[in-house]
């Protein structure tokens, strides 16, 4: 069997294990729900997981074709491809808060349908654009506009997935489900990076857009038929079956863990509640909330950490195939890219689980130290990849990509959970939207700058910036934690107080957001 088939089967095995665990083996799921409910819930989230994997394919298809052979055939420079990638990231960053608010009004299912149909139309139009051999300048303008629109409408899907899954899962179930759903999301990396070269070689460049566009259109039909906003919309379960008997968990408890003595926790909780009752509560408007966030050094530290982490992650992800193509004696084959794309995908599976396990078991629920260590390790791995990629075997290169993915994606997953636990609750609710916007702004900035740098100075500055950004992400996470330990008590609350803190990112359905 070819490397692409073997890798595809391995990823399908991960997906199957996640599906079976959620439907049959999850202890909390078995405790709270009937088997019929769990299977109906699977029928609800699995189509959204497939659609979100297709979103990733429709987002990173440009990165799959960002190699010299494809660029030269299209007449594109590295700098121009960088601007295409930046347009998509900036569109997502600017629109993120608005798509979330709109989805809250129209409902999760409608938001998901808008995302699927909108991204499908944009990708199919991109396919037509390149199939018709449109004149150069017009083609370049429409490429940027349609790709930006494609990524923008995907923001509706991010909010919709969070909203719908939160209605089907009790707080005590969401942590493990986040890992299961993350397997579905991360498989989209392979659909784009692992199969992109094969699609371009056998069908042509336009079909890296046509295929995800067609898949998303089909998934819109499936979602319209099977997905429901909440269990009560199915009309198949009684009120007794819909009751979630797990008590709501406080975000800090869910994220930090509970490793201390129970009586001590109760005493601490009682003292905090008494302080809240005695203190004067100030209700903050959205404008005042933003000011509080911008004055909070813990938040600013984590915000800068997210900026540098996204610079390293997407700066590497969008250009590593181009780098390998430039420094190796012979271009990567479709089998080679399948190995590399599969290594990145499986590394993402392992990274989120490993980093979380280390923080809980080894570091006793301390999230900051694993992030700091992983940041240093990812800097080392990125430097090693730069120095050995020209001469090492494809198998060794796949191993290095796997390790870099473990550290990069593990870091990203854990950092997205750290913020709500270390910030005061009165300003935590607004933090995640700002962090998502800053992360995608960083991604766009790296695309705009990297393309020009690579055209002018080669890949040495590219690699150096990734290593420096990795180290700085760890440093600023440490600084944010330091200021968190120093901060005084806060008594202000947001008006109105939200029932739960949601983080709108696909990597964190629990907070629920990426």
Predicted feature descriptions by range:
Residues 59-67, 296-353, 412, 416, ...:
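Extracytoplasmic gate region of multi-pass secondary transporters
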Residues 117-136, 376-390:
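C-terminal ends and interior cores of transmembrane alpha-helices
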Residues 122, 136-156, 394-410:
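Hydrophobic core of transmembrane alpha-helices in multi-pass small-molecule transporters
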Residues 146-185:
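Cytoplasmic helix-loop-helix junction between adjacent transmembrane helices
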């Amino acid at each position: 069997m070819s490397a692409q088939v073997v890798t595809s089967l391995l990823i399908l095995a991960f997906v199957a294990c996640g599906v079976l665990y959620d439907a049959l083996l999850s202890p909390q799921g078995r405790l709270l729900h009937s088997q019929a409910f769990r299977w109906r819930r699977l029928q609800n989230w699995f189509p959204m997981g497939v659609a979100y994997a297709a979103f990733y394919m429709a987002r990173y298809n440009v990165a799959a074709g960002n190699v010299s052979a494809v660029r030269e055939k299209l007449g594109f420079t590295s700098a121009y491809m960088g601007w295409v990638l930046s347009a998509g990231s900036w569109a997502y960053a600017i629109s993120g808060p608005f798509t979330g608010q709109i989805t809250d009004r129209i409902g999760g299912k409608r938001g998901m349908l808008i995302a699927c149909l909108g991204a499908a139309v944009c990708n199919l139009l991109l396919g037509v654009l390149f199939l018709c051999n449109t004149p150069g300048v017009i083609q370049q303008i429409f490429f940027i506009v349609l790709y930006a629109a494609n990524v923008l409408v995907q923001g509706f899907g991010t909010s919709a997935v969070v909203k719908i899954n939160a209605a089907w899962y009790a707080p005590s179930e969401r942590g493990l489900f986040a890992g299961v759903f993350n397997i579905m999301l991360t498989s989209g990396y392979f659909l784009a990076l692992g199969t992109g070269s094969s699609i371009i070689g056998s069908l042509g460049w336009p079909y890296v857009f046509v295929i995800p566009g067609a898949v998303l259109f089909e998934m819109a039909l499936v979602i319209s038929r099977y997905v429901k906003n909440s269990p009560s919309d199915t009309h198949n379960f009684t009120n007794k079956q819909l009751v979630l008997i797990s008590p709501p968990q406080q975000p800090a408890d869910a994220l930090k863990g509970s490793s201390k003595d129970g009586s001590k926790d109760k005493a601490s909780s009682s003292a905090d509640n008494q302080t809240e009752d005695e203190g004067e509560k100030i209700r903050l408007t959205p404008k005042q909330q933003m000011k509080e966030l911008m004055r909070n050094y813990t938040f600013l530290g984590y915000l800068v950490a997210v900026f540098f982490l996204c610079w390293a992650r997407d700066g590497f992800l969008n250009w590593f195939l181009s780098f390998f193509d430039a420094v190796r004696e012979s271009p990567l084959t479709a089998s080679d890219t399948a190995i590399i794309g599969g290594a990145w995908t499986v590394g993402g599976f392992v990274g989120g689980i490993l980093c979380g396990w280390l923080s809980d078991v080894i570091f006793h629920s301390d999230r900051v130290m694993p992030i700091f260590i992983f940041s240093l390790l990812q800097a080392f791995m990125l430097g090693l990849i730069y120095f050995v990629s020209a001469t090492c075997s494809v198998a060794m290169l796949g191993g290095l990509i796997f390790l870099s993915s473990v550290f990069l994606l593990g870091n990203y997953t854990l950092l997205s959970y750290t913020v709500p636990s270390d910030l005061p609750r009165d300003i935590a609710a607004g933090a995640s939207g700002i962090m998502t916007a800053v992360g995608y702004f960083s991604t766009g900035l790296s695309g705009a700058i990297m393309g020009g740098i690579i055209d002018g100075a080669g890949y040495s500055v590219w690699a150096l910036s990734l290593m420096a950004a990795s180290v700085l992400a760890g440093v600023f996470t440490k600084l944010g934690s330091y200021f968190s330990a120093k901060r005084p008590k806060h008594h202000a609350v947001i008006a109105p107080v939200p029932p739960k803190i949601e983080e709108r990112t696909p990597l964190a359905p629990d907070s629920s957001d990426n």
